[in-house]
Each structure stands twice: as structure tokens, then as C-alpha cells.
Amino acid sequence: MGVKLLADGCAGASSSPALSRVATSAAHGEGSPYFAGWKAYDEDPYDAAANPDGVIQMGLAENQVSIDLLEGYLREHPEAAAWGVAGDGGGDSFRDNALFQDYHGLANFRKAMARFMEKIMGGKATFDPDRIVLTAGATAANELLTFILADPRDALLIPTPYYPGFDRDLRWRTGVNVVPVHCDSANGFQVTAAALQAAHDEAAAAGMRVRGVLITNPSNPLGTTARREALEGILGFVARNDIHLVSDEIYSGSVFAAPDLVSVAELVESSSSRARHRGEDDDGDVGVADRVHVVYSLSKDLGLPGFRVGVVYSRNDAVVAAARRMSSFTLVSSQTQRTLAAVLSDEAFVDAYVAANRARLRERHDHVVAGLARAGVPCLRGNAGLFVWMDMRRLLLGDGGDAATFAGELRLWDRLLREVKLNVSPGSSCHCSEPGWFRVCFANMSLATLDVALERISRFMDAWCKATIGKFNHLQPNRCEVNYFALERYQGHVQQ
């Protein structure tokens, strides 16, 4: 059969030309409830005046509680963001910003970033500006490190629950597998040696070469900091297995209550110091410092996700060199670097900002926890981040069976989204091992909007409790926990 030609003589086809496997891969994960909730919000966004019955976005970990402090600083110091004309003394000239700059980042900005990271980590670790590699946000930093540390079909181990975006960030373009390290609520979802080994064995049985462990500390979605002993256990695990550790610490400056953050950078530095004191090159484990890499960003602690500023930090010379080469695909604009170098170099402002931001986050966190408690909904005890880990496991008991299920969790999530009009992230999208947990973000909206959201949850719980009392009165004792919980919640509300 001859080739069919269009009228102009070109070969025709019944469909569009094929795209690459990366472009058409389902590994992006856009069909997950995490992204579906965002879509529902985009289609029906809440507005107090224009759309009061719309969806409230509680699935976005964005820090808006202190943006006014940065706005105030720039009003008082307009030169920080000003464009002057060359030679007029009115700030960096347009020419300075427009022409090619050092791909490794401006020296004054890397120096300011190093000092800022030291400050928010309590001065317990030092950062060499020459080892800072800039990227367009933490998403780019994590993907860049994945490209450097692993090959397609290799595996990274990630303790659960973890940030849903990691399935996209680490897998989609790299071809690397993500293997969950299953943690549970019995110990506050802390990582254990047994859980790490089980995940490693699972990956090996599937024919995957494990190349590293990635953790978030403070945790997204838990809003907690990792215990020192847990971090030491992870360091020992990666050393014994000759693999890497990536520690995503983008919420380091958002720790607002005890215990204080323990960064892996602090542990590596103290370990290296002890080794030097003993006259050794390292701490006895083969190159522990060489296998630990830190990711940071200004998106959360400064509330600047639109500026796209991320950092890869490593003591491994080969990793730093590779990251610099690859960072040409994910540069930070000169204007962004110059503006933020001015802001971060003002020590008095930075000190005031960090203290105020932590105080505001604690106040907002406590407000949410108290509001949920009044509605009869507990949360995991948190001390960091922009979210709470909400426990709705009791609402799943009796939903289609005696035990809570992930199917029941998704039905509850759908009700919260479609009926209550709240976009929260279900625990299953974070690969949580227990159904019934939800991540609820609280810093990306006004206090007034947050109170609307809490009132909606309270009304939903009222309705659920009233329905549950009648529904379960005739059931067996193993259902009584739900009945008693509902009765207690309902009677307590009436007494108020």
C-alpha cells in the first residue's frame, strides 16, 4: 500500500506523532488524590465574598503568615530590589542583572545562604559557601541529587508517610524507584532499624540496587522533628550498606516548639570533629561525611516558593562537582540572588524574622489543634512545619467492615472534598501504612479562612456523630468505640 499524502503532498497520519516514554509515563502521579484535590480547588476556589461555598485549599504547604515582614523590609530598603543604571549609585544596574553570571551562583548570595542555614540550625553546624550548589527550588535539588546518586531502576528508600510530590520529583524523569520504609503511629512514625532493613530486603528481592535513603527533617507531612537516636541509626544503616543519605531539611527554620531540630549536618560535623581529635580521617565508618547530602530551600521558612531558590549541600567533592555541572539546567535568576543576598545579609532583620515567624507558626498551629480538638478530632503532636497530621481513624471503623481500610479513607477524603469543601491530603497519598490520617495545611490562608475551615469540620463531625449514634446502637461491642466516641462528642457539643 502506498503512503497516503495530504493535498499539499505531505505524508498524513491518523493521530499525532508519538511522544517519549518520559512524557507519557504515569510516574508523574498526577492522578493521585493529592493532585486531584488541587484540581478540585482550582475549579471551585473559596472566596469569602465571591464564592463562600467554594473549596478551601488545605493541601498546599505554603507559608504566608510572615510575608508581611519581608514586604515591610523591602519598603524600608527599596535598594535591595532596585534596578539602577550603571554608574548612578542606585543599586545593581539592569546590565548587572541581565548579562550572564557565574552559573555556580553569586558569591555574596552563597555566603549569605550559608550564614542563614547556620542560624536556623542553631549554630550547631557550619556550611561552606563554596559547597553550596544553587537550584530552582528543593524539587530541582532532590531530582538533581537523584540523577547523581542513582541510575534508572535503582532504588531510594523513603520513610513513610512522606511528601506525595516525591513520587513525581524522584521517579518521573530519573527512572529511579522509590521504596517506602513503612513506619507507624506506635512510636510517632519514627524510623526504626527493622523498618529500614525490611525495605532494603524488599528492594533487593525485586532486583533493585539500593543507592540511598531520603528523609525529611522536619517531616512533611508529620510536622515533627526526627529524634537524635533515630538519625544516628539511619547514619549507621547507610554506612553499613555503603549507600547515601539525602536529608531534605527545608522546614529547618519552622521548628516552633521543643524538641529542637537535630540536623544530619550537625551529626556529621560532630562525628568528624571527634575523628580529628583522635587523629583519624573519619569516624571509623567509611566516608560517612562523603555519603550525607542536605537539601534546603527558601520556599518554606521565608515563604518564597515563587522565587525558586533551593540548595544542595555536600562534603563529597564528586557530588558537588556533578551538581554544579547539572545545575545549569535549574539556575536561579541574578535578580533573585541579589535581592535575597541583601535581605539575608541583614543580621538584625534575619534574627527578628526567624523569631517572629516561629512564634506565628506556633500560634497558628495551636489554633488549629485546639479547633480540631473541639470538633473531636485529634492530631499527632507536632513541633514544626506548616501542617498538622490529623487523625480520623475512628471515623473509618464500621465503614464497610470492622477494620479501617484505605478504601474507606478515600471515601472519607472524597466527602471532605465534595461535601465539606476542604482539600486535605489523605494519608494514602503519603504512603502512610495506617488508613485514616490526613495532612492539613494551616499557613497558606488568612486566620479568618482557617476559622471557616474549622467550622466546616465541626459541622461535619456533628452530623457524623448524630448519624453514628443511631447507626451503631444495635451493633456488637467491637463497634462500641465509635458509638461512645460519637456520643461523647455530641453530648460535649450540646453542653457547650
Swiss-Prot record:
Q: Which cofactor names does the annotation list? A: pyridoxal 5'-phosphate
Q: Which GO terms describe its molecular function?
A: lyase activity; pyridoxal phosphate binding; transaminase activity
Gene3D superfamilies attached to this UniProt entry: Aspartate Aminotransferase, domain 1, Type I PLP-dependent aspartate aminotransferase-like (Major domain)
Q: Which residues carry this modification: N6-(pyridoxal phosphate)lysine?
A: K300
Q: Gene symbol?
A: ACS4
Question: What Pfam families does UniProt report for this protein, alphabetically?
Answer: Aminotran_1_2
The upper taxonomy is: Eukaryota, Viridiplantae, Streptophyta, Embryophyta, Tracheophyta
Q: Tell me yes or no: is Nucleotide-binding among this UniProt entry's keywords.
A: no
Q: What does this protein do?
A: Catalyzes the formation of 1-aminocyclopropane-1-carboxylate, a direct precursor of ethylene in higher plants.
Species assigned in the record: Oryza sativa subsp. japonica (Rice)
Q: Which UniProt keywords apply?
A: Ethylene biosynthesis, Lyase, Pyridoxal phosphate, S-adenosyl-L-methionine
Q: Which GO terms describe its biological process?
A: amino acid metabolic process; ethylene biosynthetic process
Provide the protein name: 1-aminocyclopropane-1-carboxylate synthase 4
Q: Which family does it belong to?
A: Belongs to the class-I pyridoxal-phosphate-dependent aminotransferase family.
